[in-house]
């Protein structure tokens, strides 16, 4: 409601507003649909409150759970865009808690168990394959699906290059 009302206020001031409402941490299309319905439910109320005929908006999701990447084709049937939350996706793929990595990742790096800290540099072989799969599957059911990255990896050059190679928009 707050996002739509803020957008309505901008429109009433003569400004453009086109919010992209992102539903986080979904694992299934049914869960996404359930949350997207909440947006659809308040939309007419906001229009009436502000005397508007339309507020353009999109509803998408963060792909942060490995299961969501695997089911991206189904989720994209409903979601209008994806943003890959690479911090949580890395955590859930590895089973590492970000709160505890300082206690063991330095040892893993020293022993060459892992080549880099996966929370600093995107693991292209594991997490990256979930991302590639999610992008491909999402676009297989929604051509032109807007896809991007959200997380610390978005500021790391090799991670950004990988995201560009798999076809992300941002």
Regions found by a protein language model. Name each.
Residues 1-170:
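Conserved alpha/beta-domain cores
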